[in-house]
Design a protein with these regions (language model features):
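Hydrophobic alpha-helical membrane segments
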Residues: 1-340
Length: 340
């Protein structure tokens, strides 16, 4: 009975979201110069590519040829699948086509600069079993210096393989979500629930379910990359499985931790469109002051990217510590059962 009670507490010992955010902020300021160097040297090219691609995708006219072709293809797929015409699906089609275009445009930078930044930050925050005892006792060790290039290079293949697998998993999550939406609207059509009110209600429920499914998949894939960067010999599907085990019972905490940094990146993207893209369209040229502002906004976006990596590393470490504590709690109970 005691053993069952111990198992029932599994998944509730991880640090809450506020504690993880405080620890991540503490780690960031402890290694401020190192992390900002990573943001300026590695994350900045990726952030600039994302901002430029977002601006090109959101341009009213003329839209890129690839974006127009992608939007037309998605529109044809939605019509062939039987989705009813509604503002929700029109907005979903536009946003999905912009997301796919931005992902494809920034993919070379994501596979190089972003993954190198993740490997570098994870190497700085990795637990070192060979470190002195006084450092191991600290809850969140400080960051002394940038990691060696060899350590980052050794971790890069595992990070790359896990990132590519995560991209396919995200594609599968989107396909599964759209399949469920198609089944829901097909069932509503068979039951005669085709009024505007029912369509609006199903669209709202579908938006919530789609956001949750894609959000959880994104959290798992992001954490899997951190696992691949911090755990030697763990890459690809093994890293994804370990990430799934780590967030078991902590999905709400993982989603809450992903929200602040993603809001920061979204704010930087909106600020770039308001301060840089709008002035570029109005004046017809990019003034030096506007170019400097664009560089500053891209750097802010890069800092948010680095903060997201730090939060993921700290959260994974808290999950590992929670699992170790649960195992230590179970050991005396199992010994007592054996003696009995």
């Amino acid at each position: 009975m005691r053993r069952a009670g111990g198992l029932s507490r599994a998944g509730h010992g991880a640090a809450p979201a506020a504690g993880v955010m405080r620890a991540a902020a503490s780690a960031f300021f402890a290694g401020y110069h190192c992390f900002t160097s990573v943001a300026a040297l590695l994350a900045l090219p990726f952030s600039a590519a994302v901002l430029v691609a977002e601006a090109a995708a959101a341009a009213p006219a003329p839209a890129p040829v690839a974006l127009r072709a992608l939007a037309a293809r998605l529109r044809a797929v939605f019509a062939a699948a039987g989705f009813p015409p509604s503002p929700f699906f029109a907005l979903l089609e536009a946003k999905l086509s912009q997301t796919v275009f931005t992902f494809a445009a920034a993919l070379p930078f994501a596979l190089t600069f972003l993954l190198l930044a993740k490997a570098c930050v994870a190497a700085m925050l990795r637990d070192d079993a060979a470190s002195p005892r006084r450092h191991r006792r600290r809850r969140w060790p400080g960051v002394a210096a940038l990691p060696a290039c060899g350590a980052v290079a050794r971790a890069y293949p595992a990070v790359l393989a896990t990132h590519v697998l995560g991209a396919f998993l995200m594609l599968s999550a989107n396909a599964a979500a759209f399949s469920l939406l198609l089944l829901a609207f097909g069932a509503a059509d068979l039951l005669g629930l085709t009024s505007r009110a029912w369509t609006l209600a199903l669209s709202a429920a579908g938006a919530v379910a789609y956001s949750l499914a894609v959000g959880v998949a994104a959290v798992v894939c992001n954490l899997a990359v951190v696992v691949a960067a911090t755990e030697p010999g763990c890459a690809g599907h093994a890293a994804v499985l370990r990430a799934c085990v780590a967030i078991r019972g902590r999905v709400s905490t993982a989603l809450a931790l992903a929200l602040p940094t993603n809001l920061g990146m979204a704010a930087a993207e909106a600020l770039f469109g308001l301060r840089v893209v709008a002035q570029r369209r109005r004046d017809g040229r990019l003034a030096p002051a506007v170019a400097a502002e664009a560089f500053s906004i891209a750097y802010i976006h890069a800092v948010c990217v680095v903060l997201e990596i730090i939060v993921a590393c700290v959260f994974y470490r808290s999950c590992k510590r929670s699992e170790a504590d649960e195992l230590r709690e179970l050991e005396p109970e199992e010994k007592g059962d054996l003696q009995a």
